[in-house]
């Protein structure tokens, strides 16, 4: 079933859009200004890596406080660089979830305040929709519908993207997300934070076939993901003392790639079996920045006579441009929200999707 995310208020379709986007759902504070044609007028980001590195992961309280300190200066920086003032902006788009609720609230309340003070429309953006629509920012020829592999630190899903606000979830993780498994593997191997890039770098010098690691759910008929068992296998391989660190990293990364390809293959066959025509196979989310993942998915797409569309790495990880662009997409369709819109820790793109069998299914 295709389920639309309902707007709280519908306005007349505007001819043009210049949207300010605010992102604060995890550990990146980001602001950007994007126009109707997808031109990124200005985009700036303040990372919190140094703040969280001593803890080996993101600390929600620290993240929220950092967003408070950094968001307003970033807004001023983007406006100054663009030569625009708030009166010239058509709408304010802010992440309203899902994510770490403290950080989400900081950004969304700031968006509401700007909307109220400047009398500009507010657009509440689902962070996942920001990722889902970013490929259309990166490739202006991409049209609906397309199949999306959304891979990040908090989510691992396969979605049929039919239109703005219309999503059908075909697969999700039944436990850990792929990016979370990368972070945990980096911690096990002592590679530091953030874990994804650290594992990717370490894997460059390793043998991807050196360590026998499982491919969870590889024989399952449904295209759902599972990475908890793989993470445990990495821990055991490391504790055995038999394998070199770079070989474990390379073998882990290859196992993840094999799972992504296998699950995506099943999803592609599923929609082909339903005679659904799509225009592209698309990847997005922080893990999509991993350069080792792309070649295998390119081969898969080509085997199904589809192009693989992947944003540049700078648009894969959390950024303000993706939120501003999602705001542009919604604003052009008249999808406007009001000041009573809530911030949400969880906000599935397809709230009516059947729950996958397994514990801890993520939105």
UniProtKB/Swiss-Prot annotation:
The enzyme class is transferase
Q: What Pfam families is this protein classified in?
A: TsaD
One biological process term in Gene Ontology: tRNA threonylcarbamoyladenosine modification
Give its E.C. classification number: 2.3.1.234
Enzymatic reactions: L-threonylcarbamoyladenylate + adenosine(37) in tRNA = N(6)-L-threonylcarbamoyladenosine(37) in tRNA + AMP + H(+)
**GO CC annotation: what is one?**
cytoplasm
Source domain of life: Bacteria
Q: Where in the cell is it found?
A: Cytoplasm
Any idea which GO molecular function terms this record carries?
iron ion binding; N(6)-L-threonylcarbamoyladenine synthase activity
Q: Which parts of the sequence bind Fe cation?
A: 127, 131, 318
Keywords in UniProt for this one? Acyltransferase, Cytoplasm, Iron, Metal-binding, Transferase, tRNA processing
Q: Which cofactor does it need?
A: Fe(2+)
The residues that hold substrate are 150-154, 183, 196, 290
- Any binding details for the cofactor? Binds 1 Fe(2+) ion per subunit.
Q: Which family does it belong to?
A: Belongs to the KAE1 / TsaD family.
Q: What does this protein do?
A: Required for the formation of a threonylcarbamoyl group on adenosine at position 37 (t(6)A37) in tRNAs that read codons beginning with adenine. Is involved in the transfer of the threonylcarbamoyl moiety of threonylcarbamoyl-AMP (TC-AMP) to the N6 group of A37, together with TsaE and TsaB. TsaD likely plays a direct catalytic role in this reaction.
This one is known as tRNA N6-adenosine threonylcarbamoyltransferase
Native species of this protein?
Zymomonas mobilis subsp. mobilis (strain ATCC 31821 / ZM4 / CP4)
The organism that produces this protein has a lineage beginning with:
Bacteria, Pseudomonadati, Pseudomonadota, Alphaproteobacteria, Sphingomonadales
Q: Gene behind this chain?
A: tsaD
